[in-house]
Amino acid sequence: MSERKIAIAMSGGVDSSVAAGLLANRGQDVFGVMMRLWNPGQDNYNRCCSPADMSNAKTVAASLDIPFYVLDMQDEFKTHVVDSFVYGYAHGVTPNPCIQCNRIIRWDLLLKKVLAMGASHLATGHYARVTHNNDVYHLLRARDRLKDQSYVLSVLGQEELSKAIFPLGEMTKDQVRSHAREMELSVADRADSQDLCFVGNLDYRTFLEEFAPELPPPGPIMDVQGRQLGQHEGLANFTIGQRKGIGLTSEKPLYVISKDFETNVLTIGERHELGRDTFIVQNPNWIQGTPPSSDESVLVRVRYKSQEGEAFVVDSNHEHATIRLVEMLPDITPGQSAVFYTDDECLGGGIIAT
């Protein structure tokens, strides 16, 4: 029996369930925890952590013969994730709530809670890897590049990584499901969850109408030359690079080039007018404590599933970092995270400001 005690964050899905099973089957001292993030009366849209999710996680824990606890974190989630999501859209940016959830909810507040419960480590069902050498922890991409989630874990530092365990980091999704069937887990064939877990079956725009009725009003649609082409229904309905749903007819495809919260202007243009080669991230987090040198070429991803580009971090301090791309990227979007890599290693990231 291992001397360490591991809390496994469970969601009722196949990934966290298999992660729990792998740890339990290795003889680890494991207990399951699940965060209650929404009031059970608010599950009419199949939002995350519904009563059904709770029941699934509890059933899996019982089948693995591990203790299971539910932690009420509704207030924290509402304040730090949902309200932040709404605030971002209300102020003209496109936030990534998964980044915020991992930074504050899972790897700060939850980690502190399980440590207080006697755990030495926190495990999750994320697809990522951690290595340790010369007293330094490294966050690596998952072996399965298609499932890799190091992007949303770029907010972690040395302290968090020293206590993080990712049992699925070397596995493919097919292997995970195969393990779930071998373990006879009730969730073996459950569908994957969506990115915006708390939105559920709602379109995010409908969610915003429910939780943020005072979003920016309709305003002008302009081209890059400053000519007005029409009227938009509110900046929250658009994101950089968007093509569909702009509301204009044109012989050539049109894309969202920028959103100006101060003037409430939506600027659109053709694809060749989209993209930048320089941008700024705010409050960058460097996993090893220091940024790459200004002459070191790195890879940057500016959205979770976007293509990566070669870049240089030419200036960085605690408040911001300036990023210069070798070639322009088309989808640099304020509010999203820019995450940096060298080969398989995630160096860290920051929120795109401008």
Please give the residue ranges for each predicted region.
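AMP-forming adenylation/ATP pyrophosphatase catalytic core
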Residues: 123-131, 135-354
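ATP-dependent adenylation/nucleotidyltransferase module used to activate substrates
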Residues: 1-154, 174-175
